[in-house]
Curated annotation (Swiss-Prot):
Protein name (record): Transcription factor GTE8
Region described as Disordered: 1-43, 120-168, 432-488, 507-529, 580-619, 647-725, 739-763, 787-813
Regions of compositional bias (Polar residues) in chain numbering: 30-43, 120-130, 146-168, 649-663
Keywords: Bromodomain, Coiled coil, Nucleus, Phosphoprotein, Transcription, Transcription regulation
CC terms in the record's Gene Ontology section: chloroplast; nucleus
Biased composition (Low complexity): 442-454
Gene behind the chain: GTE8
InterPro entries noted in UniProt: Bromodomain, Bromodomain-like_sf, Env_Response_Regulator, GTE_bromo, NET_dom, NET_sf
CDD domains per record: Bromo_plant1 (cd05506)
Length: 813
């Protein structure tokens, strides 16, 4: 029994009831609000809605009127909280229903139950067996198609009525997503896809700079998970993530690296397959609904009596909202890669690409005809995607036109017959990976622009010798596929064990032929690899040795073909032996690379030590030279000081120097003629040198030197022939004396030299020829005496004065 109660202000409200099933949608609930009077009106004029317990909503939802007039504040808050909670739960149900409608394979159609706080439950499930009855609109009319058949309606995410045909519009999108899933499975089954099946483990692979270089990591495992969970709303998002996976691999690894080559091969394979899906994408157009007509409804009439202006108006059927296609996005890595590709092909671009670039150049029409200025960062994503497609088409056409590919004959392992690798079927192996620094050998097929027929033929080709039974074909295609399968079994069985070895042999043969041609021309091309790359390649081969050997294993016979058991046993033994040898070789290469690296590190350390030692020696030698230079500077300065002291002594006045002669007779004047002015002292004394006195030698008494006051000043002296020798003999002043002979018995007495005061002043002196020798013989004054005969009496030697500072002849210290 449904109770009715009026809201304050003339409003009536309905609560949620358990909804019944509706076609193509989940649970639905509504809140109907009727405005019967003005809220500002003071009169309590209200118009009630007469509801019968048996009457239901056209969608099977019962109504209940809640009276807010008698509710307390807490009850109102509780009601508001319940309504908000139920609204959130309804949104979740609608979201799940929409997700189920867009991707029914990912979301199951099982019932989803949402619990309400009132204890009621809403069961939403999709049922095609029961359709809702016709609903009344306005004055008893229902919506019908133009052809007379009734049409069902659903509630969409916006709460409006949408046609159930909307589920049919997503069928092409679902088909395209299935094709994307098929393409992903083909990439997943490729021999090179094992590198991209899981996210990059930075710690395990020891590459800490990976996240610095790659800002948006992506892998095929994540793409597969997103595709299964319905994350991608369009195939464009799927293609962007797949391209990002291979772009990251080729960006982080150098061009000669194994992972770079694998990513390039898979990227080309994906682009070739993606063109078929891209052609099937729907254009961006709005899909309109057919017009509807209103017909009278005799089965059900509304029991609502309200003025026409206040009636609940049914929203007109809204056109189905088609989601806008996701615009393709170009990452920074893809932009830089496209720029490098454009620069490499700038000299050979065709006319239509040049016109496209001129149309979208940065400066508009201001540039000359022979100039092209393109800023990759300024162009939009749509323009860059179009440019990339044009470049891809040009490159593929260019590769298709190249006919100078030399066939390489390879001898099979089982020795059956030689085969031509360029004539064999490529299947999914459009490009083969060649170990080392050589580029992969491309086996290009016909152009991929042939349409859907090429896709069907490619799908018909077996990838792992067992997928042909899944594709229903006509009788001719079945026979052709069986024949191709048998041919593939014959070739793959003999080639799978040594696929990479055969490619190595082929590359070596090509290198040998190139070297022979180069020797004739004098040009030999060499591509030496650095030791670091070799070491890294050896480590990778050793790390993934099991996977490499597993990829080279010979597959067992399939499709019911039985071989000779003895031959199979021998082949297995040979395979095990080859596996052991190959693993041992890879380990030996890794060890050799490790030894080479250690030796290089040791040599580098020794060289660094020698360089440090040489630097220390140079520093020591420089310090030694600086010390010697400093010592020489000190010695020069000291010598200059000695010279300055000597110059000062030699230029000093005689009054400042001590003199024994001045002490003897400081007041005696010296005549200017014939006198030796020695500044009152011995020149050796001026230099600080004095004669050393012997202790044993008797010092002779100094002769009495007449004082100047005792000399007669009145005695006339002849001016001619007189020798003024001063006080004593000049030789004696120099410390030179006559040596006495020891053989003489008796030295003659020296004549007594009269003193000046004893000389008679009245004695006449001849003016001519007289020698004024100051009272004595000048020879005697010089120390020369006449030798006396033995018979004669030897005169006594005169007393020779001896200065305190005089010594014997030749005794100078």
């Amino acid at each position: 029994m449904v109770e009715s109660a009026a809201f304050p202000g003339g409003y009536y409200r309905n609560t949620f009831e358990a909804p019944e099933e509706s076609e193509g949608s989940g649970s639905s609930a509504q809140i109907d609000t009727e405005v019967t009077a003005s809220e500002n009106s003071s009169t309590p004029a209200r118009k009630c809605i007469m509801l019968n317990s048996n009457d239901e909503d056209p969608y099977g939802v019962q109504r209940q009127v809640i009276s807010l007039y008698n509710m307390s504040q807490s009850e109102r808050k509780d009601l508001i909280y319940r309504l908000k909670l139920e609204l959130e739960q309804t949104k979740i149900v609608l979201k799940n229903a929409e997700l189920q409608r867009m991707n029914p394979a990912a979301v199951s159609s099982t019932s989803d139950r949402v619990g309400f706080s009132t204890g009621q439950k809403i069961s939403s499930r999709v049922s095609n067996s029961k359709k809702p009855s016709d609903f009344a609109v306005g004055s008893g009319k229902k919506v019908r198609h133009q052809n007379g058949t009734s049409r069902g309606w659903n509630r969409g995410t916006s709460g409006k009525f949408e046609s159930s045909k909307e589920t049919m519009t997503s069928t092409p999108n679902i088909t395209l997503m299935k094709q994307c899933d098929t393409l992903l499975r083909k990439l997943w089954s490729h021999p090179h896809s094992w590198v991209f099946q899981a996210p990059v483990d930075v710690v395990k692979l020891n590459i800490p700079d990976y996240l610095t270089t790659i800002k948006h990591p992506m892998d095929l495992g994540t793409v597969k998970k997103n595709l299964a969970s319905g994350v991608y709303s369009s195939p464009h998002e799927f293609a962007a993530d797949v391209r990002l996976t291979f772009t990251n691999a080729m960006t982080y690894n150098p061009p000669g690296h194994d992972v770079h080559i694998m990513g390039d091969i898979l990227s080309k394979l994906f682009e070739a397959r993606w063109k078929t899906i891209k052609k099937k994408l729907p254009p961006c157009s709005m899909q309109t609904l057919p017009a509807v007509t209103l017909e009278p409804n005799d089965e059900r009439k509304a029991a609502i009596s309200v003025p026409p202006a206040k009636k609940r108006k049914m929203a007109s059927p809204v056109r189905e909202s088609v989601p806008e296609p996701v615009k393709p996005l170009m990452t920074e890595v893809e932009r830089h890669r496209l720029g490098r590709q454009l620069e490499s092909l700038l000299d050979e671009l065709p006319a239509h690409i040049i016109d496209f670039l001129k149309k979208h150049n940065s400066n508009g029409g201001e540039i000359a005809e022979d100039e092209i200025e393109i800023d990759i960062d300024v162009l939009s994503d749509e323009v860059l995607v179009t440019l990339r497609n044009l470049l891809d088409e040009y490159i593929q056409n260019k590769e298709a036109k190249q006919t100078n590919v030399e066939p390489c004959e390879i001898e099979l392992i089982n020795g059956s017959r030689p085969s031509n690798s360029s004539l064999q079927r490529g299947n999914e192996m459009a490009d083969e990976y060649v170990d080392g620094n050589e580029p992969p050998i491309s086996r290009s097929s016909s152009d991929s622009d042939s349409g859907s027929s090429e896709d069907q033929s490619d799908d018909a080709k077996p990838m792992v010798q067992g997928d042909s039974s899944k594709m229903p074909e006509t009788a001719n295609s079945e026979a052709q596929r069986d024949e191709n399968t048998r041919i593939d079994d014959l070739f793959v069985g003999s080639q799978s064990t040594g696929a990479l070895e055969q490619m190595d042999i082929c590359s070596q043969q090509k290198l040998s032929s190139d070297e022979s041609d180069g020797q004739h021309e004098g040009n030999i091309l060499e591509t030496p690899a650095s030791s670091e790359k070799r070491y890294r390649a050896a480590l990778l081969k050793n790390r993934f040795a099991d996977i490499i050997l597993k990829a080279r294993e010979k597959p067992l016979p399939q499709n019911g073909i039985k071989g000779d058991p003895e031959r199979l046993r021998k082949e297995r033994e040979e395979l095990v032996l080859q596996k052991k040898k190959e693993k041992a070789r890879l380990q030996a290469e890794a060890e050799a690379a490790e030894d080479a690296r250690r030796q290089a590190e040791a040599e580098a350390a020794a060289e660094a030590a020698a360089e440090a030692k040489r630097k220390r020696e140079l520093e020591r030698e420089a310090a030694r030279q600086a010390l010697l230079k400093m010592e020489k500077t000190v010695e020069i300065n000291e010598n200059s000081r000695f010279l300055e002291d000597l110059e000062m002594l030699s230029s000093s006045a005689p009054e400042q120097l001590p003199s024994s002669a001045e002490e003897t007779s400081p007041e005696r004047p010296l005549d200017a003629l014939g006198s030796f002015n020695l500044r009152g002292s011995n020149p050796l004394e001026q230099l600080g040198l004095y004669m050393k006195q012997d202790d044993d030698e008797e010092e002779p008494e100094a002769p009495a030197v007449p004082k100047p006051d005792e000399t007669s000043t009145e005695r006339p002296l002849d001016a001619l022939g007189s020798f003024k020798l001063g006080e004593c003999n000049p030789l004696e002043q120099l410390g030179l004396y006559m040596k006495q002979d020891d053989g003489e018995e008796e030295e003659p007495e020296a004549p007594v030299v009269p003193k000046p005061n004893e000389t008679s002043l009245e004695r006449p002196v001849d003016a001519f020829g007289s020698f004024n020798l100051k009272g004595s013989n000048p020879l005697e004054q010089l120390g020369l005496y006449m030798k006396q005969d033995d018979d004669e009496e030897e005169p006594e030697a005169p007393a020779v004065p001896n200065l305190a500072n005089d010594v014997e002849e030749g005794e100078i210290d």
